């Protein structure tokens, strides 16, 4: 092949980011191709739309598939480069004046066919150089994929911890305000209990804040280690075949050790102490709720709320579900326009439920209409994925860092004060009070259970 034509051919197989032959090439929407590792490293912090460095068009960084044809062509180009290298006078076997085509995996040396059959190498494991190089490169790519998945997981966890740390003090203050407000409704002799519970809450809040900072620092440090190891593997992958084989060493073992002991996000719980006489006070407003059952599809508002929730103060701390759910609703037959009302729901050890009250027009809303979680829906919910079980309240959406109730949960509706309070009946403790509710009476009780 004419050398000029060969150069043009080889030039089409060069990644524009690393300027080496493609390694596991991916082609994005605009038609330009990059090494997958180069693409990952350059656009790691851009989760959805990325701008092509060649044409500036935007594309989605999801479901990238290897361009098999381009990968085969790049492999062929490396073989041509290897053949040119091995054909040079300097690489000829000094003893037999033959081309070195064999790689000895024991002492990592290049041999001609006669040397590989000698007494010294006869019992060693041998491979053709181009086969051995591609095999080693594939091992590196497999390890890089595992490493990158862990790096992405760590990156998500770091975002979780960063968000939690940023909003933790505000969350603690909200809990303190809610408990103070509850004690103001109790007799004066509860003053010492109130003081004790608030002090314990402050102390626990500071401890968790410190632990969040430590967890965040560990994850940031682990992120640097993972990225550094990934870059080292990527650099090794791009080496010429002979250099790759001779420099391979213990890099796979070292990369495996990096994957051990990955830091996990904290699961902070800021439990509040029991409030003496809380249930007795609320039982003065006890009502019996009669429910009307119906089944709803996955487009209903509650599922939209669960899907929209992500970790921390930015509503992003609740597990994301990809499965299609079946949602079972139970509406209260009664409606409320004024006054104070209290009722309880038995939740036991279950999860993926929510209950509360909603503005009456909610029930008549078009199911296909996009739902704003801040609009007329006042719920306590519990959802679970494989990792954690999380409590949240709505209006606005907010994660509640408290232990999950294990028996009965009470709801206290105060139409005049425009508040909805949830209590852990077993613990006689306040879960949370939703303040300044945008009530549009009549209000209707609601219970929902979602099956994934």
Swiss-Prot record:
Keyword Zinc: yes
Keywords associated with the record: Metal-binding, Zinc, Zinc-finger
Transmembrane segments: none
Domain of life: Eukaryota
GO molecular function: ubiquitin protein ligase activity; zinc ion binding
Zinc finger (RING-type) stretch: 15-56
Gene3D superfamilies linked: 2.60.120.920, Classic Zinc Finger, Zinc/RING finger domain, C3HC4 (zinc finger)
Gene (name only): TRIM49C
Record-linked CDD domains: Bbox2_TRIM43-like, RING-HC_TRIM43-like_C-IV
Any single GO CC term annotated in Swiss-Prot or TrEMBL for this entry: cytoplasm
InterPro entries in the cross-refs: B30.2/SPRY, B30.2/SPRY_sf, Butyrophylin_SPRY, ConA-like_dom_sf, SPRY_dom, TRIM/RBCC, Znf_B-box, Znf_RING
B30.2/SPRY domain: residues covered: 269-452
Chain residues that bind Zn(2+): 93, 96, 115, 121
Zinc finger annotations (B box-type) as residue ranges: 88-129
Stated name of the protein: Tripartite motif-containing protein 49C
PANTHER family tied to this protein: E3 UBIQUITIN-PROTEIN LIGASE TRIM
Biological process (GO), any one: innate immune response
